[in-house]
Amino acid sequence: MTGLTQLLEIGLTGLSAATEAIQTVSDNTANVNTPGYNVESVNQTELPGAAGGPGFGTNVTSIQRAFDQFAYQEVVQASSANQAAQTVQTNTQTLAAIFPVASGGTGGLGAALNSFFAAANQVAQDPTSTSNRAAFLGEAQSLASTFRSVGGQLAAASTSLDGQLASAVQQINTLAQQIATLNQQIAGQTAASGGAPNSLLDQRDELVRELSEQVGITTIQGANGVLDVYTAGGAALVNGTSAYQLAVSSDSYGDGEPTVTYTPNGQDLTNSLTGGQLGGILSSRSQLVSAQDTVGGLAVGLTSAVNQQQSLGLDLNGKLGGPLFSVAGPTAYASQSNTGSGALTATIGNPVGFTPGDFVLTKTSSGFQATDIATGQVTTLGNGPTLNLDGLTITVSGTVATGDSFKLEPTAAAAQSFATTTSDPSAIAAASPYVATAGNNLGNIQATVGNAVSGATLPPGTAVIPAANFGQPISIKFTSSSTFQVLSSGNSVIASGSYSATSGAEIAIAYPSPAPAGDVVPISLSAGTAVAGDSFGITPGGTGSSGNIVGIAGLANQNVLSGQTLGSAYAALVTNVGSRGQEAKVTAQAAQAVLTQAQNTQQSISGVNLDEEAAHLVAYQQAYQAAAKVIATAQTLFDSLLNAV
């Protein structure tokens, strides 16, 4: 009877093993489209029999999932890189739409700049024309509106990024908590059974992959099957069965810029977070801030140059011109952790030498250090109270303690605040402040009043008329063929100079305060023959001239920001945004290709192949039928034995 009993038990083990194998195949087939599912297979071993005899059937030792750690990690890393690249591409497309490119490399703001300067040239054709002046003022207002529109679109894009940032952080926290919960369940089942809880492992691996789409991570396998998860910078998101949260906070300067902090200790992780959607958002934000600063810089450069030129000319009422544009100045924010009472204010004194960008100024024991936020470049400054940085003049007030810091945003608010200051066409200072009239001269030279110049470097030998005489009539009289004097309206000598028959002579009338040194009205005496007694009258009030509006129109071709013209600076911005967009597109395509390849490799190992499962099902069905036949044979033998008794 023992042999027949063993035969029956052997058949039962085969039947049980085949049943479990069929169930496994069925589970594989049912989960063919389940994200994160790893195909499973049955591991069997023979039940050993007596020495020298057959075994006692089979035993299912485990249900093993086809999991390859290397292939899985490749998918995780590729998912993180791809999501970052796709996020950057999407946000770069948004940025590119704000700076359209038309023929000639300009569009939007570039076209508005061109129209403004073209209208200035129209005024120069007929400076007394009210319609020309009104058209110029209309283009100035349109230009200001375009600046504000671009600034508003950039601000809206920034708000959108802030929303994306908050959403990504919330998703990271949710996934981290779910992974920690699964860690607890996996550890419990592993300790209780000693086996691998395949379904829970699949779920956790899928959550880890989803987490990698949100932020770059690394993982470490712990005891009892738990998995620890860290950001690329080393902050623990999951440690065993505990999850740690991230939070979105305002930076310590209170300027409204969000930062990502680590809840357990409040550490700012913003600069250490890479990969995934969060890394893509942070990268996109740096591009956006750069564009905001550059557009703001254009507004500041244009305002400074046009207003300065306006101040050198006369309006239709015979008065020196007032500002045409207004724009918000630099903003300095004190860190909330400062211990001193100090404050900073700043002005952009020289836009030509200024490169738009934001800085953090930190007080050290030896003075101030300025760190360029975009590049990390550190510049050592003095102790104050006046500091000079890249075209900026910074004034320090109060008591600044060592370690105190300030965030300086020179042009962040400029574009949205850009506006015209007048609606009166007669306020346009189109005229040069002086006109020249020749006396009854015997010589053949001419005197020409040039366009007012700001920040001029005068050639050697220039006769400079003091600012105290500005706005008064003066006269130039030759005392010989090679010398001349400049006389005030009271016939006092206020300047003198030498004259060359081959090169002429230069005279400059200095502007009064608050105009800076170097602001002058140039007067040129042409080459030729001068005779003692020859004279020229230089009189103010030439409101019908166009000398100063020509100077305003000429600003289109002068360097006004970072050593560039307005047009070239804007074209460089558009080109940069366009190239960044193309680069982001190529990177996104490459990242998607890498991810697809990694997924295909991983699926070839761990994915469900329905053809293979169909073949397995037939094999296990036959095994089941064979095991059932063994049981039936054992039953027949039992019946034969009983019938023989």
Q: Predicted segment positions?
A:
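S/T-rich, low-complexity, solvent-exposed segments of bacterial secretion/appendage proteins
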Residues: 1-645
